[in-house]
């Protein structure tokens, strides 16, 4: 075979694969975009209803029992984001029943005042749809991995309106230092289509108005200091979530008792800390921190504790938006002490702690670009880099593996990766 024949053969194969993924990405984006928009609206209306009817908080224990029953009926007990990540890593099956289970469970949690996010739920639903669609189409294991990544990206994009960050996050979060770049085009295509669906239904993308300080040596040094502090908070956030996740079930092994007691405790702590401020995702507090420079000194600690308690007791949602809350409020409070504007420090904190908690450096920088329209991107990237480097080889997801070292340009040994995973467990 001469060079021309080789070129022609490779070109035909590439076009065939590109067409295959385009034909899959379009329906994937439409389906995840529609369901993601529906999920966004459901959580939004649940939040508005709870704000208008504060007594709904007292139904949280009953909502917890319903969620536990729902997961038992669908046989999804113990299934979460880690299972979806393992589906990408090793092809572990993900039940399609996870979609209605996490959808309804998250809406009930937000309706009745549980302190949780929504992006973790989006990753689970998108990953479940992608994996099962790939199975239905009888795709090979490596292609089903791409389908799972595309579903995750599409759902994430539909909720936040950040298609570029969504695609890269879905590609990179499973294995730190390893990126399946072949998944970019289908994942980004699905994310763009899902984003378009959300716009068509009137969902505004998540954007913040931000004024960045001048880029100079002094400002860069201050951002470095903030990044160091964010790394410590990121470690605290992840440690608290994992500690509660493993301790609470040992103290209350019965899931029915655990979720009911957890609901009662969340009610009590909500009244102790301030009803409404730490319930739900807390987007209003995030907006106040980033756009108005307003936050209470203890906001980030209260959110860490209530989110860890909510999720450990069996309520559903995600950890991503709580990481935004923790980062924005922490940055808003600490930034002025260092000499940074409160609003800008909140933005740096938001993206940096998300980065440290998820170990997704490039997606975090892209998220900062899309959330803040590129304002202060160099400084935000600097804060992310420092937090990423110092946050350690652990994060929100225990199934996440570290292929490369975060401190040196070297591969991690298999023994160390296993050690890290066992430490998380």
Can you describe what each PLM-predicted range is?
Residues 1-425:
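Alpha-helical transmembrane segments and immediately membrane-proximal extracytoplasmic
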């Amino acid at each position: 075979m001469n060079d021309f024949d080789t070129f022609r053969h490779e070109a035909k194969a590439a076009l065939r694969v590109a067409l295959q993924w385009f034909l899959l990405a379009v329906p994937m984006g439409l389906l995840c975009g529609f369901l993601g928009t529906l999920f966004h609206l459901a959580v939004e209306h649940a939040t508005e209803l709870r704000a208008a009817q504060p007594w709904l908080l007292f139904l949280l224990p009953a909502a917890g029992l319903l969620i536990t029953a729902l997961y038992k009926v669908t046989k999804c007990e113990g299934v979460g984001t880690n299972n979806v990540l393992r589906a990408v890593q090793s092809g572990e099956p993900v039940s399609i029943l996870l979609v209605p289970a996490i959808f309804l469970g998250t809406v009930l949690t937000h309706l009745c005042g549980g302190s949780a996010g929504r992006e973790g739920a989006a990753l689970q639903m998108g990953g479940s749809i992608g994996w099962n669609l790939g199975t239905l189409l009888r795709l090979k294991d490596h292609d089903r991995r791409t389908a799972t990544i595309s579903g995750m990206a599409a759902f994430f994009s539909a909720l936040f309106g950040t298609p570029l960050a969504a695609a890269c996050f879905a590609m990179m979060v499973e294995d730190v230092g390893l990126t399946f770049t072949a998944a970019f085009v289908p994942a980004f295509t699905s994310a763009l289509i899902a984003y378009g669906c959300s716009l068509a239904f009137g969902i505004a993308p998540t954007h913040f108005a931000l004024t960045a300080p001048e880029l100079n040596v002094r400002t860069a040094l201050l951002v470095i200091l903030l990044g160091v502090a964010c790394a410590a908070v990121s470690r605290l956030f992840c440690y608290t979530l994992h500690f509660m996740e493993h301790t609470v079930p040992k103290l209350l092994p019965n899931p029915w008792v655990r979720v009911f007691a957890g609901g009662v405790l969340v009610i009590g702590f909500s009244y102790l800390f301030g009803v409404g401020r730490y319930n739900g995702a807390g987007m209003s507090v995030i907006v106040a921190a980033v756009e108005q420079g307003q936050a209470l000194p203890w906001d980030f600690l209260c959110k860490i504790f209530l989110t860890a308690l909510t999720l450990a007791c069996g309520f559903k949602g995600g950890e991503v938006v709580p990481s935004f809350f923790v980062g924005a409020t922490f940055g808003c409070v600490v930034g002025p002490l260092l000499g940074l504007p409160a609003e800008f420090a909140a933005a740096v904190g938001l993206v940096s702690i998300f980065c440290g908690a998820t170990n997704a450096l490039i997606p975090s920088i892209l998220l900062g670009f899309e959330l803040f329209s590129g304002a202060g991107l160099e400084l935000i990237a600097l804060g992310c880099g420092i937090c990423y480097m110092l946050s350690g080889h652990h994060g929100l997801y225990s199934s996440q593996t570290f292929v490369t070292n975060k401190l040196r340009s070297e591969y991690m040994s298999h023994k160390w990766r296993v050690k890290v995973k066992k430490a998380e467990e």
